[in-house]
């Protein structure tokens, strides 16, 4: 029988190393699934927050249009100064609310990115553990150093 350099000539077994390799492979699969699940969950939360922002912006725009109509009606003497003031206050409140919701969406995006980076870092750590386990298992193989018989 001839062998070439780097041919496996003896395969040793170490049940502990093999078990560690299997555990690391399973942990990596779990970590990857966790990252994907987190990404989906956070994207859904972001969409919910964006829907709230859209509603707040819509409410503000409606209040803005109503306030403009109230201003014209007040100039024409159709509504009181009190009704106009209430309309202005409502518009200001809705504007502030829309701004807050916009800030929340921005904060949600930053939070989402940070959480995903952390989850990916955990996954990368597990991948590193798996790579080490693979190297340890591969080191159990005795290979020919040169071509021979």
Q: What are the language-model segments listed below?
A:
Residues 1-45, 75-83, 149:
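Long, amphipathic coiled-coil "stalk"/hairpin helices in large membrane-associated assemblies
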